[in-house]
Amino acid sequence: MRRLTLRRQFPRIRGRGRSSVVELIDRLGPVQSQVPRGPFISVAARLPGASYSAVSAAFDAYDIVKATSLRGTVHVSTREHYPLVDAVSQRTLASAWRNQLRLERLDVQEVRNEVERYAAGEWRVRAELLEHMRAWLAEHESAESAAMMEGQGASSLVRAHSALLRRPTDGAWDRRTDVLHRSASTVFELTPVDPDVALVELTQVHLGSYGPATRRDVAWWTGDNLTRVDAVIHRLGDEVVQLRGADGVTYFDLADPPRGGLPDPGLRLLPEYDGLLLGYAPPARSRFLNLDHVDHVWFRKNGVFAPVVLMDGRIVATWRLVKSGRQVHLAVRSVPGEPSVPADSLGEPIAAVETALNVTIGDVDLGRETR
């Protein structure tokens, strides 16, 4: 099963330019991207040789777009997949909007409409957007609702409305400067999608990228509930097949899954929040990682998933780039119980990261603490 997934996660794609980057993101589906450099490193791992300028060009042309969507987390997706994640996210997060903003007079859609209207004419700075909505809620809803905007929960929902795209102030898509927001419908032509239809298509995207997968994996990844996911699987009929895993669990897969790809991509440096972990519900992340080792890659206190090393089809270490003056070094820490990462096998993965991030990596430290 692991090899089936790796073939989809590491497809064979011709070229290393902008169009190849877009094709990769299309194959992978929405990529979780709380860390801005994440998509660049994901491209480096799966399309080694693709450059920083190629990834940036795809962003600049809005061939791939960044928005807060599935499960209220930042994702990068193709322009074609974006309406799907937007539709599903708006539905699944509606109750959170209602509760966090203490809405009584207004419904959620009225508030969202105002967010989109304000961000329609130009790219809005995050602080300006939040202040506008605080004042608007004070006038149209209540003082209590406006006061909720002072807290992180309500303000995060508003600035993270999935109908808004994010972009950096300085063109550096790999840095934490993506504090400009604009309604997606005013950036490119956007046809609204019914959320039930969107969930069907996203289920197909998920199985095509992470399958075979369980119904709980699909529900977790999309942020939707099991009842709706079960209805989708029933609706797909013979477009999906059931498989019985060695663990006795029922898995689902596309009847006609993607072909080709690399069943063993070798050693790769994967980004924070990589799909080999975050593409599955927490109990199912054992496909590529021993669950006893989760605490070595997931820092529960702040919810951060470390960048990880894939070797022989398993996650065996974490890594990070360490700045020392003007130099950048690579620090790798093995996961206890897993094989050590051989220094002589890191050459190509390092070169791929250097090209994708436009950096030069100096020393490699296989013993330095990465936390």
Where are these regions (language model features)?
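Long, low-complexity intrinsically disordered regions
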Residues: 1-285, 289-371
